[in-house]
C-alpha cells in the first residue's frame, strides 16, 4: 500500500471457554494486544474476550464500533474504518472463531479493500475448518450452507438437496444449527438421509468437552447421546454409490 492508512487485522475469537494461549498463536496475540480500535458484533462480549487476551491498553480506553448485522450492507466508511483512514490499525472480530466466515464481517473487509486499506488475516480457530479436518470426509471439495430452514417441507427438501449435491459432486456439505435445535436436526437427518450417507457432528470444538462423531446415518439412528445446547457443525457426505436406491 502506498497510502498512510492503518491496517485492518482480522482477529480470531475463541470458540468457547478456552484459554486464549491454547488456541491462538503467540504472534497473533502480540498483534491483537496492541490494537486500540475494533469493529465487533457485540461490545460487551468482545470486551470480555479481549480482557482475557491481556490487552496492552486499558479495556475502557479501547474503541468499539458495533456492526449492525441487520443493516450491514449500508456501511459508512468513516464510521466503521475511520481510525484506519487516520493512520491507526484496527481489528475486526467475530462473535466466535475467525471473522468473515458465516458472519457479516466480510462487508467490512470489502469496504476496506475499496478504500485502499490493507487487510491482514490473523491465524486462529475456525469451527468449519476444524470440523472438516476431523470428519474424515472429502477436504478437496466442500461447501458451507449456513443455517438450513427451520420448518418443513423446506427443511426436509434442503436436507435431501445436500445429499444429492454431495453425491453428484463428491463434495462435503457443511452447515450449522442453533444449539437448542441440535437434537431435532439430528432426528431430521436420520429421517431424510440414506442409511449409508455419512454425517459428522462436531461440538464444542477446542473446548475440554469437545465431541466429534463421524458415522453413517444407519449408525446415527442408534445414537443415545444429547447434543442439546452444544455449539456444533454438521457435515454431510454421500459418496457415489453403486446402489440405485436414492431419494426421488
Regions found by a protein language model. Name each.
Residues 1-69:
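Glycine-rich, flexible N-terminal cofactor/catalytic loop recognition
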Residues 2, 6-10, 88-89, 168-248:
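A contiguous loop/helix-start segment that scaffolds small-molecule binding in enzyme catalytic cores
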Residues 9, 103, 107-165:
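Class I SAM-dependent methyltransferase SAM-binding "motif I" and its flanking Rossmann-like core
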Residues 15-17, 95-99, 179-180, 239-242:
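Short glycine-rich anion-binding loops that position phosphate/pyrophosphate groups of nucleotides
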Residues 32-38, 116-120, 172-173:
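Short active-site oxyanion
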Residues 39-40, 91-99, 172-177:
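Acidic beta-strand-to-loop metal/phosphate-binding motif
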Residues 65-72, 148-152:
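Conserved helicase motor
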Residues 68-69, 76-119:
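Glycine/small-residue-rich loop that forms an oxyanion/phosphate-binding "nest" at active or ligand-binding sites
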Amino acid at each position: 500500500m502506498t497510502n498512510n492508512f492503518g491496517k485492518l487485522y482480522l482477529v480470531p475469537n475463541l470458540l468457547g471457554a478456552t484459554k486464549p494461549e491454547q488456541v491462538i498463536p503467540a504472534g497473533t496475540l502480540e498483534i491483537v494486544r496492541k490494537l486500540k480500535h475494533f469493529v465487533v458484533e457485540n461490545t460487551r462480549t468482545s470486551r470480555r474476550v479481549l480482557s482475557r487476551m491481556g490487552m496492552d491498553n486499558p479495556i475502557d480506553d479501547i474503541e468499539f464500533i458495533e456492526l449492525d448485522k441487520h443493516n450491514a450492507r449500508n456501511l459508512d466508511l468513516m464510521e466503521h474504518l475511520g481510525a484506519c483512514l487516520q493512520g491507526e490499525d484496527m481489528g475486526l472480530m467475530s462473535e466466535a472463531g475467525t471473522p468473515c466466515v458465516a458472519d457479516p464481517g466480510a462487508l467490512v473487509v470489502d469496504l476496506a479493500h475499496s478504500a485502499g486499506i490493507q487487510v491482514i488475516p490473523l491465524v486462529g480457530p475456525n469451527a468449519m475448518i476444524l470440523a472438516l479436518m476431523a470428519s474424515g470426509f472429502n477436504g478437496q471439495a466442500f461447501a458451507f450452507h449456513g443455517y438450513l430452514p427451520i420448518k418443513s417441507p423446506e427443511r426436509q427438501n434442503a436436507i435431501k438437496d445436500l445429499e444429492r449435491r454431495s453425491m453428484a459432486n463428491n463434495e462435503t456439505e457443511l452447515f450449522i444449527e442453533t444449539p437448542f435445535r441440535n437434537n431435532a436436526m439430528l432426528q431430521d437427518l436420520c429421517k431424510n438421509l440414506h442409511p449409508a450417507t455419512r454425517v459428522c457432528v462436531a461440538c464444542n470444538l477446542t473446548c475440554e468437552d469437545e465431541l466429534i462423531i463421524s458415522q453413517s446415518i444407519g449408525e446415527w439412528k442408534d445414537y443415545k447421546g444429547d447434543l442439546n445446547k452444544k455449539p456444533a457443525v454438521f457435515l454431510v457426505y454421500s459418496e457415489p454409490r453403486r446402489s440405485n436406491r436414492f431419494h426421488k
